[in-house]
Structure formats: C-alpha cells, structure tokens
Design a protein with these regions (language model features):
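Generic structural detector for well-ordered beta-strands
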Residues: 29-33, 60, 70, 83-85, ...
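Short, cysteine-centered beta-strand-loop-beta hairpins and adjacent loop/turn segments enriched
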Residues: 74-78, 127-128
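Beta-strand/loop substructures that line and gate deep hydrophobic ligand-binding cavities in soluble
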Residues: 3-7, 19, 83-86, 92-154
Length: 154
C-alpha cells in the first residue's frame, strides 16, 4: 500500500510543472521635447537601440519582426533573439525575447503637445539586473538627449 502511494506521489511530482522564476518588473517615463512622429521614428530604428540602451552591444535585423542582440548585463556578453510582437505606428512597440533569458517590454508614445511626447517604458524580466528601474530611467534619459540634440540641429 505504501509503495503505491509513494509511486503515485513521485509520478505526480514528475508531472508537476517546474517552479517558474520570479518576474521582475519596472516602469519609467520621460517627456521628450520633440513631436511624436520624430520620437517614434527614432525608437523604431531598432538597430540603433545600443545608442541609448547602454547594456546592448549590438542589434541586428533578422527579418521584419526578429532581431539578434548582444548585451552585457553584468560583465559578461550574452546573445539572444527578440521578437516585435506588436507595432502600432506612432503609438506603441512591444517585444519579447525568444531565448533563455526571458524579457518582455513595451514602449508607448503619447503626445503632450505638438512639440512634446511622453515616452513610457515597461519591462518584465526573469533576469534581475541591479536597479532595473534606475537602468530604465538612464536609458530613457539617453534617448531624450539623443532625440532632442537631433531636434535642435534641425
């Protein structure tokens, strides 16, 4: 009797899903002094993300919705692929990785005025970089400076 109970418990444990890692999430926003079309257009140049997302070393287009990337989160290079799962021109871009280090995110664009745009970045990840929220704030600050410098030159 005890043998069959133990065997059933073992079988049930083997069929049970593995414990899922914790999901870390962060959200930040910034107001960029530029029209929404210009702001969206800059972010949608996916290969240029390393210009303001400093942990990214390289992004290369595979096809219209898939990109390979190399990033340097904590002193070591990691590679992966991400997929653009939603793109609403002028409004929103959402993505998720399809590699081992799960990460998903969405960046949204809202006009504040004809010459100002609010950019909101939300990220969810099983990877726990130190101060995820602070990193998003840094990336958005870099993006703001990049866009506003280009806007000032025009």
């Amino acid at each position: 009797m005890h043998g069959s109970l133990f065997e059933n418990s073992t079988e049930a444990m083997n069929r049970a899903p593995a414990v899922q890692p914790a999901i870390n999430a962060a959200q930040q926003f910034v107001v960029v002094r530029a029209p929404i079309a210009r702001v969206y257009e800059q972010w949608s140049r996916i290969e240029d993300l390393p210009r303001f997302v400093t942990s990214l070393r390289q992004v290369r287009r595979i096809d219209d919705t898939h990109f390979s990337y190399v990033w340097h989160p904590n002193g070591e290079d990691k590679q992966g692929i991400f997929h653009i799962v939603l793109q609403i021109p002028g409004r929103r871009i959402a993505w998720r990785t399809i590699s081992n280090d799960f990460m998903s995110g969405v960046v949204s664009f809202e006009p504040c005025s004809e010459q100002e745009t609010e950019v909101t970045l939300k990220v969810r990840s099983i990877f726990d970089p130190p101060n995820l929220s602070r990193r998003l704030e840094e990336y958005l600050g870099n993006f703001k400076r990049l866009v506003e410098r280009a806007e000032d030159r025009e």
